[in-house]
């Protein structure tokens, strides 16, 4: 999409919507001003306004789901970049000459730490590794593996599942270190379905991340889990619209309940 022009440039999964002036179309129908924003950026803005990023100036969010989305907030504003593709952090290279990502590039973070490729790596390991595993028993019974099964097996001490999980955490830690080296944000926020693993994600990730970080006092960028769950995108989209009206970012924290889980 083009935020500046209010256009859909290309939707690979929905043919026929190329170069669609969406904002103009909806604005004419509704007789109201319309703004356009990427869903990952909107979710990051929601967390910045009244979630895990409330009160900071600079924040980077990674959304860990079937893929890895991201949003970058710099001095309270969404960063789009010159070509409006400045927040594709799921496609930063974390393994030179690594495995091929769906985007066509080799070694992308998404290829190593998303839920989709976590499951694919587990399936591949089950074929090449003879160790007993509850994951193997699940596949024999005809059950399709997903990331939740891998996390649960890891919690139970399954060696193969732990290998799969810690591999994903290693590459995610590399991605977080790269973010710190480039942006030096106040914090990194993690969202998406994988964050439901809670401390089973945050503890090993933080240990690996801290081992790679600068050994300087007071420069450790914290990694936090998102607080708004699936509401973040809606809240952020409302914030984008509110800000576009010239009213400044809203304070919506008084209307929020306890932290939500991702769906």
Residue spans of the language-model regions?
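Gly/Ser/Thr-rich active-site cleft segment
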Residues: 1-22
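Conserved Rossmann-like nucleotide-binding pocket used by diverse enzymes
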Residues: 10, 60, 224
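ATP-binding/phosphotransfer module of carbohydrate and carboxylate kinases, centering on a glycine-rich
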Residues: 3-5, 23-32, 46-56, 78, ...
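Short glycine-aspartate micro-motif
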Residues: 35, 58-63, 69-71, 102
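Structural signature of FAD isoalloxazine-binding scaffolds in flavoprotein oxidoreductases
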Residues: 85-88
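Generic enzyme active-site microenvironment
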Residues: 37, 45
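Active-site glycine-centered loops adjacent to acidic/histidine catalytic or metal-binding residues
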Residues: 39, 65, 237
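A cytosolic small-molecule/anion-sensing beta-strand core signal
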Residues: 4, 38, 74-75
């Amino acid at each position: 999409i083009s935020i500046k022009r209010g256009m859909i440039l290309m939707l690979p999964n929905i043919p026929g919507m190329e170069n669609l002036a969406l904002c103009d179309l909806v604005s004419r129908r509704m007789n109201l001003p319309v703004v356009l924003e990427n869903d990952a950026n909107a979710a990051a803005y929601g967390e910045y306004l009244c979630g895990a990023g409330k009160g900071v100036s600079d924040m980077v969010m990674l959304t860990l789901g079937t893929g890895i989305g991201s949003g970058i907030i710099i001095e309270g504003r969404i960063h789009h970049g010159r070509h409006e593709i400045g927040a594709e952090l799921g496609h930063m290279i974390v393994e030179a000459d690594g495995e091929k990502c769906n985007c066509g590039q080799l070694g992308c973070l998404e290829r190593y730490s998303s839920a989709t490729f976590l499951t694919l790596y587990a399936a591949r390991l089950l074929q090449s590794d003879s160790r007993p595993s509850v994951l193997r028993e699940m596949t024999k019974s005809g059950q399709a593996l997903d990331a939740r099964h891998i996390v649960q097996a890891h919690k139970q001490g399954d060696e193969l599942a732990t290998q799969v999980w810690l591999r994903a955490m290693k590459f995610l830690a590399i991605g977080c270190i790269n973010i710190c080296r480039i942006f030096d944000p106040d914090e990194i926020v993690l969202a998406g379905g994988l964050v439901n693993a809670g401390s089973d994600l945050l503890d090993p990730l933080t240990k690996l991340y801290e081992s790679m970080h600068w050994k300087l006092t007071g420069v450790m960028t914290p990694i936090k889990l998102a607080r708004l769950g699936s509401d973040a995108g809606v809240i952020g989209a409302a914030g984008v619209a509110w800000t576009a009206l010239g009213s400044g970012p809203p304070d919506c924290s008084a209307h929020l309940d306890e932290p939500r889980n991702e769906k």
